[in-house]
Each structure stands twice: as structure tokens, then as C-alpha cells.
Amino acid sequence: MVAAGTDAQFAAVGGGDTDTAATTTGERIMFAPGAAHMDDAALRIVLRHELFHYAARAETAADAPRWLTEGVADFVARPPAPLPANAAETIQRGLPTDADLSGPERSLAYDRAWWFARFVADTYGTAALRDLYVRACGHGHPDLSAAVQQSLGSDLAEVLAAWRQWATG
């Protein structure tokens, strides 16, 4: 683990930006300078999230769906919490894209990814979430639709409709 001294060092070595608390690249978890100002609970969440990426790195393909890798990392890292009032509306946007995860509404994109992982675990079980991760994110993975069908036994459209319903409580 490395704590960057400056934003420039964090960007150069860790590949992060000023809105990111930490990154995992290869053999290193790097914390941004701003992580020093996080409270203990938030820092533990970031550390668990990055440790998941570190532990899963050998089994995660470079072209894995980023939203799923981030959503499962957040599922592992974040404590259970009630869905906010805007969750159902936000989920209507669908699964986040890579651009969403890096864009101005990145926080909501990460939340959508996390909520999808929570939905899968709540509805199908944590073993099914793990299986979906391995199938959809592992080396030589099929497309997402095939991975969802194989892991959850439903087609992607049905799963997304059930996710939207789940978000309404």
C-alpha cells in the first residue's frame, strides 16, 4: 500500500484523479492525498473496496465490465444501508457505463453498480453474485447477457426489470 504525497503523484503512479480516494493497480493499492482527511469508517470502506480489487485481480479480465467489478467491490466494502428515496428513479437509467463511472455523476453510477450487486445477492444469494462475477468478469468471459443467463437462470431483460422492481421496495 502506498499513500501518494500529491495529486500529481497519485495520477502518475496510481492512475487516479482528484475525485478518487484510492486505486488498485497491479501489485499496489494507492491512496490519494485526500484520503488522509477521511473519517475512519469511510477509510475502512475504501480499503475493503480496494482489497477486493487486489484479491480478485488475478481472476479478473482486463476487459471485464467495469461497473460489475466496482459494484461487487462496493458490495463487499460497504455496510448494508436502506436505499435512498431516489434509488428507484436512478435505477431507471439502467446499468452504468464506463463513461458514467468516470463522469460528473460518478457517485450515482457507483451506487447503481452497488445496488445491482445488492439486488443479485438479496434475490439470488451471495453465491450467485460470486458466480456472476466469475463468469462475467473472468478471463474469456462471455457477454453479460450470457453470463446473467448462466449464473441467474434468467435473461438480462428479466433481471433488469426485477432490479427496478426491487428498488421500489
Describe the residue ranges of each PLM region.
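Walker B catalytic acidic pair
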Residues: 50
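Surface-exposed, flexible loop/turn segments at secondary-structure boundaries
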Residues: 9, 37, 81
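Acidic/histidine-rich, surface-exposed loop or edge segments in extracytoplasmic proteins
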Residues: 31-33
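A mature extracytoplasmic/lumenal domain signature
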Residues: 3-5, 35, 136
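Auxiliary, metal-adjacent structural segments of Zn-dependent hydrolase domains
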Residues: 1-27
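Acidic/His/Gly-enriched intrinsically disordered linker/tail segments
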Residues: 20-28, 41-46, 54, 58-169
